[in-house]
Amino acid sequence: ELPKYLLNSTGDEFFIPDSWKFYWDELVGEKHVRYVPNSNHSMAGTDVIDSVDAWYHAIVHNISMPRYSWDVADDGTITVFSLDEPAAVLLWQARNPESRNFMQAIIGKAYTSTPLTEIEPGVYSVKLEPPASGYTAYYIEMAYPSGIDTPLKFSTGVKVVPDVTEYEWEMAPASARER
């Protein structure tokens, strides 16, 4: 039940950007995720250390975390509900015109951000249509005051459109998992 702060790369060489959907609902207790834009697995050259510093400062000094929740709907709509006012809310998106591969080594630093405004008090929402060809990955990032110079940064899970894959997932039989 310890608080969790997951830091994921948008351009990871080993994990797909929307991998959160395979484990997020199973995590118990307080949980936050941040996708670090334009990063590879190492996250070198990003502000990830600042994010850890702000998170650690809040935990050590018993500072209340921002009250928010998020949802990624099947139709691609990403919605953030925030009871505390964020300092900034950004839509991050990247496109690969050829494949569902968002590794930084393939698409470079392709993620761009656009500020989002509330659609009603404390609610931010976005839905991107699938491109005519290729794929688009997108998510919302929220920054909140942390009590130090570096903000607390959290994000939603990443949505990839169109939501299709080249191969179907088949879970291994239970007997294979019992080893």
Indicate residue ranges for each PLM-predicted region.
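Acidic catalytic loop of the alpha/beta-hydrolase fold
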Residues: 11-15, 41-42
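Short alpha-helix in the alpha/beta-hydrolase fold that links the catalytic acid
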Residues: 16-24, 94
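Beta-strand-rich binding/interaction modules
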Residues: 87-94, 100, 137-140
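Short, aromatic- and glycine-rich surface loops/edge beta-strands on solvent-exposed regions
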Residues: 132-147
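Short beta-strand elements
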Residues: 147-179
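Catalytic histidine neighborhood in serine/cysteine hydrolases
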Residues: 27-43
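Short beta-strand/loop motif that positions the catalytic acidic residue
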Residues: 6-8
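Surface beta-strand/loop "capping" patches
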Residues: 47, 53-93, 109-121, 127
